[in-house]
Curated annotation (Swiss-Prot):
The gene is rps6e. Transmembrane segments: none annotated. GO terms for cellular component: ribonucleoprotein complex; ribosome. This is Small ribosomal subunit protein eS6. GO terms for molecular function: structural constituent of ribosome. Disulfide bonds: none annotated. Belongs to the eukaryotic ribosomal protein eS6 family. Signal peptide: none annotated. Keywords: Ribonucleoprotein, Ribosomal protein. It holds the Pfam family Ribosomal_S6e. HAMAP family: Ribosomal_eS6 (MF_00512). One of its GO terms (biological process) is translation. InterPro entries: Ribosomal_eS6, Ribosomal_eS6_arc.
Amino acid sequence: MVELKVVVSDPKTGRAYNVDASTGAAGAVVGKKIGDEVDAGPLGLAGYKILITGGSDQTGTPARKSLPGAGRRKLLLAEGVGFHPVMEGERKRKMIRAHQITPEFVQVNARVTAYGEKTLDELFPKVEGAEKKEKTKERKVRK
């Protein structure tokens, strides 16, 4: 059973929305590649088209567009997705997932390329009580 979390970003507003895709809905994304445009109707976004921009598997291994295939490989990386060097010229061998979306993926990142009739705010209403709580630290004061 394939369960994916599809994170859909709206470039107009800058907001991101989470879509939980179970077996049937995940079929719209599984088998596609990073950079493919997909109809988002099966994900509950009627009329929308999304562009797959990335993702990661259950171990947190990121997917890289430049790596063809469907598996995981160790690559010597100097920059880009999966590695951010600290020093100039630094390289490191890192585990990277290939660009084809498989059932091992847990999260798929996408952005909207074509909009439907309803806005994303209408499709994903705000949940009451989901506001960010202000973090306050109680200080111990000596008396």
